Amino acid sequence: MLISLALLAGCDDRAAMAARDDGDPMQYGGVSGLNYTPYYIHTFNVKGHDDNGISGGGPNIQPASPDNMPSGGGKETCCASFHKKWRPGLKVTVRWIANKKLDGIAWGAWYKAEAEVPEYGTATYGMWAIFLPGDRVKVMIKDGNANGHNRVWARPADDDPYVGTGTVDEELTRQDEERREKQRQMKIAREAELAREAELSKQHETTQ
């Protein structure tokens, strides 16, 4: 299931602000990711809890290198929304597709994890999701590491309190599998129809 994002104009990482009804201003930025796992990540999305306004979806990310260097970071998608001013308790749910079968055929399963966004400064440069072994993930707002929590290229510590541990999202995976099976059956039916049309056309030509 592809998660669609509203494409917002002017997706500068320093971002224009949008005022919320509660007076808590939001801003927009790009979404990027790093992958420390050996598995391909097809897509991911972030959604805030309790309608806190945080949202975003990121690009696909290749597996980490054999020497455990992360992949990703070279591209971003538009756009994430997050608070101009950080406050404690900004929690999000992250969902992503990871292909662990490594057979080049399987699509992979959806995973989900809950995490809290660490403190960030006022000069921000977009949202980042850092995927770690053990189905773990950290979501941060890049800010030049103003408060010591958001060094994008430093692997989070194993005991980092802002790292959430995920589980398979059984329902979303099932829905995705059903959708793909329906598409597969439609493709088979269409190919069979085209084959019948070709055979009828061939028979018609031989009778002329």
Q: For each of these PLM feature ranges, what is it?
A:
Residues 46-102:
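Tryptophan-paired
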Residues 27-29:
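Structural beta-strand segments of beta-rich domains
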Residues 41-42:
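Short acidic/proline- and small/hydrophobic-mixed sequence motifs that coincide with surface turns
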Residues 1-5:
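Sec-dependent N-terminal signal peptides
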Residues 87-208:
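Beta-strand-rich cores of mature extracytoplasmic or soluble domains
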Residues 11-15:
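Bacterial signal peptide processing site
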Residues 32-36:
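Asparagine-centered strand-capping/turn motif at beta-strand->loop junctions
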